[in-house]
Amino acid sequence: MNKVTDLRSAIELLKTIPGQLIETNXDV
């Protein structure tokens, strides 16, 4: 179960990182 949670957490982080990069680029 822990592995599944880690995978989900990693996916969420990956989705969040690109979103932040896009927002930062848009602001710049």
From Swiss-Prot:
GO molecular function, one term: protocatechuate decarboxylase activity
The protein's enzyme class: lyase
EC number assigned by the record: 4.1.1.63
Keyword Lyase appears in the UniProt entry: yes
Source organism, top-level taxon: Bacteria
Documented activity regulation: Inhibited by oxygen. Completely inhibited by HgCl(2). Partially inhibited by ZnSO(4), 2,3,4-trihydroxybeonzoate and 3,4,5-trihydroxybeonzoate. Unaffected by KCl, MnCl(2) or EDTA. Not stimulated by thiamine phosphate, pyridoxal 5'-phosphate or biotin. Not inhibited by hydroxylamine, NaBH(4) or avidin.
Catalytic activity: 3,4-dihydroxybenzoate + H(+) = catechol + CO2
Temperature effects on activity: Optimum temperature is 50 degrees Celsius. Stable between 11 and 50 degrees Celsius. At 55 degrees Celsius the half life is 1.5 hours.
The keyword Lyase is assigned to this record: yes
pH effect summary: Optimum pH is 7.0. Stable between pH 6.5 and 9.5.
UniProt keywords, alphabetically: Decarboxylase, Lyase
Entry function: Reversibly catalyzes the decarboxylation of 3,4-dihydroxybenzoate to catechol. Inactive toward 4-hydroxybenzoate and other benzoate derivatives.
Subunit structure: Homopentamer.
Protein name: 3,4-dihydroxybenzoate decarboxylase
